[in-house]
């Protein structure tokens, strides 16, 4: 396991040994490692830090690199991993996000991209406004896979265009100034497939499409869809098998039409 004690510090490898039990997943392995915090040679160490929540591949919290592939720890079954490599299992934190400690990373940039593209439907209040617009069953079937995105970050970690952004607070810089500088850097950097997918989801929704131009403006600004290199790694690693490249293609077309319309004063 690749460990790191704090943000900005050097990482180091550590070997642990866990007794095998049937039907274990990587999250259960990490639970046992944290409960018995010592290396394979018996040296006491600090308990491993990692993120998890739902344990059923819904929340997206437990993303890490397992045997060289970014995926969810809760659905990574030990028996299957050992069948591929009986000698050991290798765990590393995601490579495109700043490490907080060990396998836990900061995904602020991921969520900032969703804010940037307005990945929500605005609500004016909580009054009963009656029935909303209807959506055809065919449209529902097409939209549902896009809705299943759990912001896990797998697509971003596998993307060659999505490079790591890790800033540190300067001497004399206030927390507010640092937050503003970090936000600006996030906005200049590639938003990623997850954000493009959410633009497609909300812009295809009968209510969400009322803010379609706002989302297209955001996704064509700096760090937008024009930075996508079409490597298609995102769709290959998505644990929900979301058709990300289809969303990218549709938003690419919509963005082109939006810009042409804007150029000609439409």
Task: Go through each PLM region and give its residues.
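Glycine-rich phosphate/adenylate-binding loop and adjacent beta-alpha elements
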Residues: 66-91
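Short strand-turn-strand beta-turns centered on an Asx-Gly dipeptide
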Residues: 2, 19, 66-68
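Eukaryote-biased recognition of intrinsically disordered, low-complexity regulatory segments
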Residues: 1-16
